[in-house]
Amino acid sequence: MADTEIKKKRTFRKFTYRGVDLDQLLDMSYEQLMQLYCARQRRRLNRGLRRKHQSLLKRLPKAKKEAPPMEKPEVVKTHLRDMVILPEMVGSMVGVYNGKTFNQVEIKPEMCGHYLGEFSITYKPVKHGRPGIGATHSSRFIPLK
């Protein structure tokens, strides 16, 4: 019975951003791309990218080009948490500053239209432990250590 079954080739879901696949996104101009983005990102691109943002966009392809084949590119560090992730940034490694350290972020196609800062958390999430002295009325009966 196993011989008669035809093995199905595994198919992976192809990435699309609002119905447009990544290859077409890369070929689009900024004006066409802006029509797909949300209002906040449209406004950002419409007002133009500043010099710092332009220099980041120049450094990312350079790092990708210098990387050996089948290897991840060198990390490009930046403080630009407000940079909109564009399709040409996909596949790059970016070190996003969170106020203390640079968090490495690998740009994936699903991140298009988001900001770099969304992927580098600026605070340490709270780990709730035992209550301290005077936290509640019942804490009077909690022994000290």
Curated annotation (Swiss-Prot):
Classification via InterPro entries: Ribosomal_uS19, Ribosomal_uS19_CS, Ribosomal_uS19_euk/arc, Ribosomal_uS19_SF
Keywords tagged on the record: Cytoplasm, Ribonucleoprotein, Ribosomal protein
GO biological process: ribosomal small subunit assembly; translation
Gene Ontology terms, MF aspect: RNA binding; structural constituent of ribosome
Keyword Nucleotidyltransferase carried by entry: no
The family this protein is said to belong to: Belongs to the universal ribosomal protein uS19 family.
Descriptive protein name: Small ribosomal subunit protein uS19
Species in which this protein is naturally found: Xiphophorus maculatus (Southern platyfish)
Lineage: Eukaryota, Metazoa, Chordata, Craniata, Vertebrata
